Amino acid sequence: MRMLIAGGGTGGHVFPGIALAEEVVGRHPGNDVVFVGTERGLEAKVVPAAGFPIELIDVKGLKGKGILSLLLNLLLVPRALLQSHRILRKWRPDVVVGVGGYASGPVVLVAWLLRIPTAVQEQNAIAGFTNRVLGRFVDAAFTAFPEAARHFAGRKVYQLGNPIRRTLMENYMRPEVKHPRPRMLVFGGSQGAHALNMRVIEALPHLADLREALAVTHQTGARDREQVEKGYRACGFEPDVREFIHDMSAAYAGADLVVCRAGATTLAELTVCKKPAILVPFPAAADNHQVVNARSLVVAGAAVMIEERDLTGELLAAEIRAILTHPERRERMARAAGRLGSPQAAKEIADVCAELVRRRWGSPAGQERPGHGPVRPPDLA
């Protein structure tokens, strides 16, 4: 089976796609996956680093733009459709999956016109604009939250969770590690989060009595690294401050509490890794979807949510103290998070895609069809 995964822009779209790709290529030696994205998106860097080929198209978002920007971006659509057609003819995929982001729109639409099986994977509780549009056409819509189902026709919705990377999935089966000191992991996404960084620093004076008992790993992004590290040291903490954490599996494994945003991929990782969390949703997220995402963990007892407008150093410190100084509460939250985890999401999504392939092409997933086999084009061999 050859799968084409389209979309990206942010890690929340890209990393579930990579997790699905890992599952597809890992289940059969004849399977392969190609991505389609844009030069500006995160996918242009992380997809090749993950070992997958990527094609780039010229397209920009249409939602939330001024009139001039909207008109200019609309002018790119015909070209993006032609580029998508060329890519689909070149790779001849058995199935096309859109993972959200504006790059997925033209590719999935052209695939549908070519009668190639199509699907979308919606990571959030409130479906994004592109997925809502594509949901009218595709053969399947994979969701992680029950709230997202209302955006798609019921017969095609599969609530299977968000795929996560294999290295993180290993944490689901890993026994709970008892650390000599509780460790707090703080991160705001791949670029960091300035507001979250600053509120954590403001919380430290209220946690000064815990400085010998608390270990901290903090991903700041490039902008705030120096200021954050100085803030910790001024309060007597010896933190592990980094611009970017490359091995999130190890970071999660070493954490007893996570303070972070509420993107869908982050929440999927928290639940599979069984980590209690203090969630600070990104206030500018489309349709306020991070708040809706976070509520599912809060209701289950796996997390505490503080909206950014309410976040102060004193309040954050109080929540950190209430969780880290009560091991029994941490354990309850960890168990609740684990019950929400979907470690088989990538496998189950790949299973449905394989069935779409069988129905359309009349051959088992991974089996070659005349004129189409699992061979990469010569320039990417």
Curated annotation (Swiss-Prot):
UniProt-listed CDD domains: GT28_MurG
Ranges for region Disordered: 361-381
EC number, UniProt record: 2.4.1.227
Keyword Nucleotidyltransferase: no
Location of this chain's protein in the cell: Cell inner membrane
InterPro entries, per the entry: GlcNAc_MurG, Glyco_trans_28_C, GlycoTrans_28_N
UniProt signal peptide: none
Domain of life of the organism encoding this protein: Bacteria
One annotated GO biological process: cell wall organization
Major localization class: membrane
Binding site for UDP-N-acetyl-alpha-D-glucosamine: T10, G11, G12, N124, R165, S190, I245, Q290
NCBIfam families in alphabetical order: murG
Function of the molecule: Cell wall formation. Catalyzes the transfer of a GlcNAc subunit on undecaprenyl-pyrophosphoryl-MurNAc-pentapeptide (lipid intermediate I) to form undecaprenyl-pyrophosphoryl-MurNAc-(pentapeptide)GlcNAc (lipid intermediate II).
Record protein name field: UDP-N-acetylglucosamine--N-acetylmuramyl-(pentapeptide) pyrophosphoryl-undecaprenol N-acetylglucosamine transferase
Gene: murG
